[in-house]
Amino acid sequence: FAESEGGETVMGTLRSTLEQILQVELDLTAAGRTDAGVHGWGQVITGRFPDHTDPARVQRSVNAMLAPAIAIRSAEWVADEFDARFSATSRAYRYDVWNAAVPNPLVARTAWHVVEPLDLDAMNAAATHLVGEHDFSSFCRRPQVPQGAPEKSMVRIMHRVDWHRVAVDGFSDPGVSALLRLEIAASSFCHQQVRSIVGTLVDVGRGRRAPDSMLDTISARDRAAAGPVAPPTGLVLWHVGYDGERWDADRRR
């Protein structure tokens, strides 16, 4: 999502399009710096815009130019001190897994295809150990810091981690659906934390780890103790919270 040298990104494309519309240079801030391949349904972005900017017009213009790959779902003025990233107090993600022998082309771009049958109860039993305040070093890719600088804390407060089945075409009963969804929310997340958690929980579902082994994985504070990093395809930044309140286009519903 975030801009980088020599690569096309969502933020870079959005910023250049907004600058083309408004004829000014812009500096934008996003609530989440998601990896390539991750979706951002509830991404929040702020920036300093000219006083004469009409949010509704900007939204229509951007959507006409960038849809369907990129779309603004809501646009409005906020207080000067509001910052999409630093004002956020919680973030929620979803991760979808298509758990069936046969692939589903309809969800191929938004779900990880796992062939082996997964034990959903075992995955949820393991997930309960993640809730609360923990050092999540085992699930995080540590950022590089200058020599002599202190390491950044990997302590986070996890509010919710649970799996459930989602109704999808071909399965009239959600209880037998092959589409599994993880709902996960925390004060904030470190780099690759959600995908590392997903990979570890899927290992539990495959029977490669016991549910209670999650306690040892957390206490190890070692990336090697966790499972593989799940593919980015199934991950969605679902919504961002500010002072306990959800702030996105869906909050008005």
Protein language model annotation of sequence segments:
Residues 1-253:
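Structured-RNA-binding interfaces characteristic of tRNA pseudouridine synthases
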